[in-house]
Amino acid sequence: MIIDNHVHVGWFTDGYHSPKEIWVSEMAAGVDGMAVASTSTCAELYKDVCRELRELIRFGGEKVHPILWLTPRMLKLNYPLPYMLHSKIKWQGIKLHFESHPEWSKNRALLNKALDVAKLLDVPVLLHTGNFEVSHAGRFKDVIQDHSEQTFILAHGRPIEEAIDVLLSCSNTYVDTAFMPMSDLQKLVEEGLTDRILFGTDAPINKVFFKEIDTSMYIQDTINQTYKILGDKADGIFSRCIYGE
């Protein structure tokens, strides 16, 4: 059983990635289920987001775990959030991206409103972590500790030392391996954090960086590399999914 906990669909900088493309690529790589957020959210294309997730659900049913990517604009306007929440899609996670939407870091009241949406839906919060300071894993430590009753996922685990510190300090936190260097994955294993790791690939964003590599091949290669690092611990991590619990 392999669950890809970090997948995208929709419009991105390199063009459009259709639900069929994503479904076929993941299945061809041997993936059994996926947690998916639509990158069309960044263009505030709410109808497209719902259409894309519905189509993926038609392909995979309960194998598809829809993630609702929230933007500040969605919470400021009257219609987007109610539209998404009443779309009959069973959202199983909330995503926040502080690099794409830096207002999250400047407006704590708005951030708390987003976290309230996750609390209302009783779903985990996926936080993009990256190389820009606004999205460093350590920047989220206070927020995570202040909301100890909620579950958080540090997407990518960057920088890894900060991600490890948050994981060791906050028992309500996981990390996903999307675009994570194998050396960082090894550090998580050495810290005894294998039970907090969620396998993820960030497909099909690989096409931005590795245009010549088919997405299904990229996913399969990521699976193979992960097996080499995790050994007999791999099966437990590949099958772990906290969305929809």
Regions found by a protein language model. Name each.
Residues 1-5, 16-34, 119-120, 194, ...:
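Mid-to-C-terminal alpha-helical segments outside catalytic/metal-binding sites
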Residues 2-5, 35-38, 67-69, 95, ...:
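Active-site neighborhood of phospho(di)ester-bond hydrolases with catalytic His/Asp-centered motifs
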Residues 2-11, 126-130:
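Histidine-centered catalytic micro-motifs
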Residues 5-8, 14, 21-44, 63-71, ...:
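Divalent metal-dependent hydrolysis catalytic cores, especially in the metallo-beta-lactamase
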Residues 11-18, 40-48, 71-78, 101-106, ...:
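Acidic-and-aromatic substrate-binding clefts and catalytic sites of carbohydrate-active enzymes
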Residues 32-33, 47-124, 171-173:
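Active-site gating/metal-coordination segments in enzymes
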Residues 93, 107-198:
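Catalytic pocket-lining loop regions of alpha/beta-barrel enzymes
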Residues 192-211:
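Short acidic/histidine-rich active-site segments
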